[in-house]
Amino acid sequence: MTYGPCGGVGADGSCEVGDFRCTFLDLPLPRWTGGREIRGPGAGHELLDLAARRPLIVSMLPAAPLDARSITECAAPLRGTVDAVLAGDAATSRVQFPPAYRARLIQDEGLRVWAGVNCRDRNRVALEAELAALAHAGVAAVHCVTGDHPLGGGRPDAQPVFDLDSTRLVALAAEYGLLVSVAESPAAPPVELRTERVGEKARAGASFAMLQYCGGAAEVAAFAADCPVPVLPGVPMIVDREGARLLRSFAAAVLPEGFTETILDAADPLAAGIDVAVRHGRELLEIPGIAGVVVAGGVAPGAEPTFAEALGEVTRALMLHAGGALRPRGPDEWILTRPSE
């Protein structure tokens, strides 16, 4: 990694890989010095047009890995309730369909794709080919991350690549005309340099920042006010203890006070999880200048369809709150329209 520190820095300054201090904490923040040739946002114009009118509603797609049928099943509850789905990495399922192929499967289900690309699994040649394929597939945007170390996921036996890091990947994606977002962890050390770090990624070509959980709406608002690009904070979706355990494992993730307890102590954690996520999402959408929200969480194997239904309930409510309008398209389907239509 050249442009660190990544988001995997613990509150005590430790690296997520092992019991040692992040080496970047004692160094000046690396500055972006590379040039960039941006060909235009391509298919990203649709998202930019929406973002100019109202906050974006994005969600994860909780499909089982390497399962096209699961993608179809989990896409149905989200169709028409989100502006795009984030098809990114998964800590418990490192082996996924390649981003461009997965994007095509999702697009076939009528959803825009915000495709996640990490630097852990491919060298720069393979990454460039993947970005070219995503641009050709017409994805709405790409989310460029360095990627979690494999020691912390479902395939600790895999060798990490990290030929590039997220900042250099951003520049490469921008050259292909892709609309680019990056990740940031506002609560991870060095906290005082996190917005500057986003600034360096913006200089490389990033247009949005998706935020790791960093507390309540006040904490998000404080970070957003100083961030050089529009932000999409995360709305944590918890419906059971396994999902709560996964979110607690994220480095430097800070959930709103009492968030998890309110859900797990309820008689119906699923219903409570939906209610709490909607209320928190609405609070985030009220932050001035917010670009949108990303609803996501941990899902137990086999529970993907139920989790997708819950996500759809949350995103439907947040879409209406954000100013979008929903109308029936079929017996059990919805499509998004502008309020004036």
Question: Where are the predicted features?
Answer:
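Conserved N-terminal beta1-alpha1 strand-loop-helix module at the mouth
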Residues: 40-84
